[in-house]
Amino acid sequence: MKTQKKEVYNFQSETKKLLHLMIHSLYSNKEIFLRELISNSSDAIDKLRFESISSPELYENDSDVKIQISINKAQRTLIISDNGIGMTKEDTIENLGTIAKSGTKSFLQSLEQKQNKKNELIGEFGVGFYSSFIVSEKVSVRTRFAGLESNKGILWESSGEGEYNITNIVKKTRGTEITLFLKKEEEEFLETWRIKNIISKYSDHITIPIHIQDYDKKNKTYFWEQINKAKALWTLNKSSITEEEYKDFYKHLTNDQNDPLIWSHNHVEGNQEYISLLYIPEKAAWDIWNRDNKHGLKLYVKRVYIMDNSQAFLPNYLRFIKGLIDSSDLPLNISREILQDNSITEKLRKSLIKKSLSMLEKLAQKNNEKYQIFWNQFGLVLKEGPAEDHENLNKIANLLRFTSMKSNNSEQKMSLKEYISNMNEQQEKIYYITADSYSSANNSPHLELFKKNNIDVLLLSDRIDEWMMNYLSEFEGKKFQSISKEDISLNKLTKEKKIKNKDVSTEMIEFLKKVKNILGNQVKDVRLTHRLTETPCVLLSDSTEMTTQMAKLFSAAGQSVPELKYIFEINPDHILIKKICTINNENELHQWIKLLLDQALLAEKGNLENPHKFISRMNKLLIK
């Protein structure tokens, strides 16, 4: 027989780095490699089932799908095989020679930075095949894609040290067979009982039968024993599933090694029939902030696997939810493209959004401590909701958490209902302020009048907050009001009244005119204010113009930002204003007015265009 020529390939540079991390430092819990390989085999069989719907010949007269594991102690090998879809030569290069996933560099950086969380991160990333090198000195893969001739088989071999070999072989059966040549110190994985325990622990709910070859000492024969239950857990009655089984299934589904925070299992009948099993993780994935990364639910139709990461059923702001949906109404041959425009999909989507939000509502009502864990991990993602989902706006708003002026700390624990329940009797609006940080918001001069009159204010300091507030106009009949806008009125709540010229001294009126003249078009207007108690002046945004925080958002996104012109308000009762009002030297008065404007700009924006000029001006005035 003619010897087939080996082709030598180099691993992609990032794959080399990942292999090095795995082999030398990654899993403290090494047994997970078997879970990863079984999961890959299960996926391969799921893909075969899906493809065979339109091409039944792919079964090659063998529809009895299974995963088999055998041990050879003499050769120190562990073999995991399946009769799934298999791989072509191109598939082996793409799937085994490179990490074909966006965000790889970020992932590797995260691994290096979080040495104590490597297991957790590698599970999130899901690079299952490479985990075989944790316990193996060499890995051999024999595979043939379903439907191809037997002489189109591929042998892939590597010791995980920089290169791999590919050879054409004859393989009579479709599917993939992985042979692990175990390291001497990993011989525990040659014990049948050990492999059975790992399968029961991690893969009991794989829907494909998993068999292990065992030896009958009495009859001196080998036999195949099925280890897992091979039942679709989500199809079972909720009352028959234990909490531990739900948790184990979540870990199998997501590769997350932590328990889920909560889950919701629903069997829906009627106009639409489906089963959903939705989980909320305990911790956010390392790439949760990347809206473009793959996310979504695993889709089944009548128990047949269709696709992973189907984004058609949940919006982006719920991308932290993991799980699956099994529909009885969708066609088996549905594609990703058709799924997006399908009327059944839209109905399922609406239903699943309501189930998801209801799950969070129940958690917030029944277990505030757990809900706070959720909020700390995923609150920023949920804040995208008001902009994306107007239909469920009130439900989302009810789930939001804030800190406030009266909270005296930065922890976001207050709901809008709680804020309203503590409002003053005649208060008609929900007051808030946005800033770059909690400290900036909590120390803003805009709060002075509210502190004086014991009116609470929500302090919003997350980057997304200003954007979110554009879509939150009211909650339970109470309108939201930014306290940094000019159109604020507290007349009903306080004894303060808008300052009128007749109530102000002639000197102060003249001073106001001078300030307007000096600042000219640097500001939109100059006014006396009733808002301030401790600060000499403050800047306000016009009610119709872009706010400071929104301008910062636009700028950070590379968008052009219109020039902001503020309303400059002066506190006539402040001692500094009274002193400046008496200055007769025109140049000195100019310097003081510009210094006041710079101070107000610094308080409002957190920075100045020319800080050196500000410092120089301040030093000169201090010397005087």
UniProtKB/Swiss-Prot annotation:
Region (A): 1-336
Entry keywords, A to Z: ATP-binding, Chaperone, Cytoplasm, Nucleotide-binding, Stress response
Region (B): 337-552
GO cellular component assignments: cytoplasm
Major place of residence: cytoplasm
Function noted in UniProt: Molecular chaperone. Has ATPase activity.
Binding partners and assembly: Homodimer.
Family listed: Belongs to the heat shock protein 90 family.
Name the UniProt record assigns to this protein: Chaperone protein HtpG
Gene from which the chain derives: htpG
